[in-house]
Amino acid sequence: MASFTNVATLSYGGNQVSSNVVTGEIREVLTVSKTAVPAAYAVGATITYVIYLINSGTAALTGLTVTDDLGGYAFGAGMVYPLRYTDGTVRYFANGALQAAPDVTAGPPLRFTGITVPAGGTAALVYQAEVTAYAPPTADGVISNTVTVTGGTLAGQTATEEITASQAARLEITKALSPAVVAENGQLTYTFTIRNFGPTAVDAADDAAVTDTFSPVLNDITVTYNGTPWAAPGDYTYSAATGVFSTTPGRITVPAAAYTQSTDGTWVITPGTATLVVSGTI
């Protein structure tokens, strides 16, 4: 809500006198808010945004344009954008009723045009955006993006929403077999590679564990973790009868990822890595 002041001046006979100061307020007819779900992001994740418009006036607000800057920030000589609109996801509501989808310019910036907010009513835009490689994945990473509503006599109301980089570990595991063709009674080796793409290390308190059922079962197995020999039952358990192999919860630890920003503005993630190797005869 903006306020204004005004003072009159009276001139007479070479003299000048000022009036009292009067103060008024300009009550904004349109209120704009913006929310994001979820509030934490990772590169490649989908964020749902909700733009909520409230018209407190007695006349409908028509022909509005809603512009989202997609979190763009200056990098080098240009701009980079940590968000990308997901085509076809917008839903437009007036007083809670679903309307035909507005015209969309994916941008950046992202624009929705032809929006109407009923008199004394509400409108909402719900849409999704993908987190791009320009989003900082670091522990202090933030995406701040602003929506601006223009049209008619509106001055350009804005609303800003911030989401923060997820602080959780993000693990992936891959499994490799060597050799792919093995002779009867030959030796097989399974290599499990565990990668952490998150900014937080996985330590013993996280109780991470790997479980597998080897078929065919392995006999006389040997196990190493990051090149260090492991022994049962402290580090793992294994049943040669069933082929069920399990590491002891907490023995799997994986360092945090490292992050660097490239010259083009994209972030490169170097995951923390751990390697579990199990060998035996069939």
Predicted regions and their residues:
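Exported/extracytosolic protein signature
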Residues: 1-282
